[in-house]
Amino acid sequence: MKLLALVALCAVGVASHRDKRQLSIGTISVSGAGGSTGCVVTGNVLYANGIRLRNLTSSEQSELATYQTEVEQYKTQLRNILSQRRENLRNRLMSQGRNQQQQSNDVSSQGGNDDGSIPKAPEKPSFCTAEDTTQYYFDGCMVQGNKVYVGGQYARDLSSDEISELQTFDTQQTAYQNAVQSQMQSQVQGLFGGSDFLSALFGGDRFNQQQQRQQPSSTTPASTSSTTLPPKPTVPQFCTAIF
């Protein structure tokens, strides 16, 4: 079993290869520890993945101030929910020796303030988009924001034709990677006995019902999609690495 899983993981790694894109979007750190990936603003200067972009406008500075307030509120809500859930868990463990009715009452009374929902993270500011932070790694260079970087140093801007070429490559590469992932899932499912094995492992009828909702017509198309992949997109030649 372990060998089969390892083979599947290796196949995914080979399919990805070096010309795949890397999407780097900044995340909110509840603990306060962060980094330079994604969008970073300091002194009203905007950076994307450590690369300086431009100064913020006055309206963008106001938008950033609103975002900072919302982030602090979001962090506070998360901490309160985590604290409440730790308290609920502690009460459940302490009440194991009591009778079932008493335990039920304790859990319901302590968990009344926790509805199980996680607050939604605030929307990123309009000046921090996926287009700003997406990095495309090719042999010898990296492209971000339609600019070419070599060894972390700015080299040049893409031409209008190259920008169109990159957009086409992005669309085709995304479709190719999705098809590879879908094929791998079908192959792994076949290796482990299909839905019967997974049903026995993960919960019987509930798993079957979920699979039927997600894949209502998976009987015939599965065999075709598992063997057919779109052509691998042609990698743009924005730079030449000499080996």
UniProtKB/Swiss-Prot annotation:
InterPro entries in the cross-refs: Pepsin-I3 (IPR010480), Pepsin-I3_sf (IPR038412), Protease_Inhibitor_I33 (IPR051901)
S-S bonds: 141-239
Region (Disordered) location: 95-126, 208-235
Glycosites: 55
Leader sequence residues: 1-16
Localization: Secreted
Gene Ontology cellular component list: extracellular region
Ranges of compositional bias, category Low complexity: 99-112, 209-229
Family: Belongs to the protease inhibitor I33 family.
PANTHER family named among the record's database cross-references: PROTEIN CBG07421-RELATED, PROTEIN CBG13105
Protein name stated in the entry: Uncharacterized protein F32A5.4
Lineage: Eukaryota, Metazoa, Ecdysozoa, Nematoda, Chromadorea
